[in-house]
Regions:
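Divalent metal-dependent phosphate-bond-processing catalytic cores, especially two-metal-ion Mg2+/Mn2+ enzymes
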Residues: 5-12, 26-53, 64, 113-205
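An amphipathic alpha-helix signature
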Residues: 10, 14-18, 41, 57, ...
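Small/polar-rich, solvent-exposed N-terminal microdomains that initiate assembly or binding
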Residues: 18-27
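An active-site-proximal "capping" alpha-helix that borders the catalytic cofactor pocket
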Residues: 40-44, 75-90
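His-Asp-centered metal-binding catalytic motifs of divalent-metal-dependent phosphohydrolases/nucleases
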Residues: 55-72, 76, 80, 101-110
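Hydrophobic, well-structured mid-protein blocks that either form specific transmembrane helices
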Residues: 82-115
């Protein structure tokens, strides 16, 4: 696919999302706050430029993708889809058929999913959500641990962080990449090199 310049979503949709959806991320842990959702939106629009897709749909899927964290992490992808489906105001910009595709994409974005997303919209947001910057991922993992496991000491946080990194990003880990045009494959190899380099990894704690 030949990349074109990323298109901008409809201003009225952006205004609604900025006022009603983005602020929801303020209550989530630091690894999934407003900086995270804005990054996923930006990366989704960049990836969408490689494909013949609806920019507004891509934008909204990215904006809603983690809203379900309000109900906890385990079912957040399902709850996020429920939140999107229940938002009657989205009918101003999207048809029922579009909303169904969007709900599926939100539901299927989770990194631990064993199957690829069924549509290009799902693959775009899933790939955009995989922000594979080695140092950033380690720091986000540490932040998540500090927020959710405050009783752990330094060594406990280090052990939890290493376990998570290996389980998700290591060789044989559950992370899957879905978009060929993404730079995530190269970045994943860089992260795996960092995971193997224990002295360097320890310096990030």
């Amino acid at each position: 696919m030949q990349m074109t310049a990323p298109k901008s979503p409809t201003p009225s949709l952006v205004e609604y999302v900025e006022a009603e959806i983005i602020p929801r991320y303020d209550s989530f842990d630091r690894a999934h706050g407003t900086d995270h959702v804005r990054t996923v939106i930006r990366r989704s629009l960049e990836l969408a430029a490689h494909y013949d897709v609806d920019t507004d749909m891509v934008y909204a899927i990215a904006a809603y993708h983690d809203t379900g964290l309000v109900a906890g992490r385990e079912r957040h992808h399902l709850v996020s889809a429920e939140i999107l489906a229940a938002d009657s105001r989205l009918a101003r910009w999207f048809s029922a058929e579009q909303l169904a595709v969007m709900c599926d994409a939100v539901e299927e974005h989770r990194a631990s999913s064993k199957r690829p997303p069924r549509t290009i919209y799902g693959r775009i947001v899933a790939e955009a959500d995989r922000q594979i910057d080695a140092v950033t991922i380690v720091r986000r993992t540490i932040q998540y641990g500090l927020d959710h496991y405050p009783a752990l000491d330094r060594e406990g946080h280090r052990a939890r962080c290493l376990e998570h990194l290996r389980e998700k990003y290591g060789e044989g880990g559950y992370l899957r990449l879905w978009i060929a045009e993404s730079e995530n494959a190269r970045r994943l190899e860089e992260l795996r090199a960092l995971i193997r380099d224990t002295p360097r990894l320890d310096r990030l704690f």
